UniProtKB/Swiss-Prot annotation:
Belongs to the phycobiliprotein family. One of its GO terms (biological process) is photosynthesis. Induction: Phycocyanin-1 is expressed at similar levels in green and red light (constitutive phycocyanin). Constitutively transcribed in vegetative cells, not expressed during hormogonia differentiation in red light. This is C-phycocyanin-1 alpha subunit. GO terms for cellular component: phycobilisome; plasma membrane-derived thylakoid membrane. The lineage of its organism: Bacteria, Bacillati, Cyanobacteriota, Cyanophyceae, Nostocales. It comes from the Bacteria. It comes from Microchaete diplosiphon. Its main location: membrane. Light-harvesting photosynthetic bile pigment-protein from the phycobiliprotein complex (phycobilisome, PBS). Phycocyanin is the major phycobiliprotein in the PBS rod. Keywords: Antenna complex, Bile pigment, Chromophore, Electron transport, Membrane, Photosynthesis, Phycobilisome, Thylakoid, Transport.
Length: 162
């Protein structure tokens, strides 16, 4: 999985050199941010269930047809609702992974790369997940640096889906 730090080390190693002062400064910057990122990951993990459920309800409110249209990819049944919450939780989990590693690698590697194909195959609308992520961003309860860190990855996911 790529992160800014692993990419810097890989580049230096492939060129047979030590890390440059700029690369080392980047590493120090990341370590200074790490505390805020880990606090955000911890808080989001602790609230994951309520955030995913609330986000699903936000989707149902904005897109009411999702709860009235029949089919395995809609939330007209409890099974469909459970799948929706599960899928939103997956996005949230990827955000927490990004916070832990300090880069967009988890979103890039595990989600964004194949999202268009997944959405097309299962007739899922990216706008549902955009709405869910907006809800999470507005309701995660974080402030200060942890909020800045979390919001940057949430925004990254929103932009990738838009």
């Amino acid at each position: 999985m790529k992160t800014p730090l692993t990419e810097a080390v890989a580049a230096a190693d492939s060129q047979g050199r030590f890390l440059s002062s700029t690369e080392i400064q980047t590493a120090f910057g990341r370590f200074r941010q790490a505390s805020a990122s880990l606090a955000a990951a911890k808080a989001l993990t602790e609230k994951a269930s309520s955030l995913a459920s609330g986000a699903a309800n936000a989707v149902y409110s904005k897109f009411p047809y999702t709860t009235s249209q029949n089919g395995p990819n809609f939330a007209s049944t409890q099974t469909g609702k459970d799948k929706c919450v599960r899928d939103i939780g997956y996005y949230l989990r990827m955000v927490t992974y990004c916070l832990v590693v300090g880069g967009t690698g988890p979103l890039d590697d595990y989600l964004i790369g194949g999202i268009a194909e997944i959405n097309r195959t299962f007739d899922l609308s990216p706008s549902w997940y955009v709405e869910a992520l907006k809800y999470i961003k507005a309701n995660h309860g974080l402030s200060g640096d942890p909020a800045v860190e979390a919001n940057s990855y949430i925004d990254y996911a929103i932009n990738a889906l838009s």
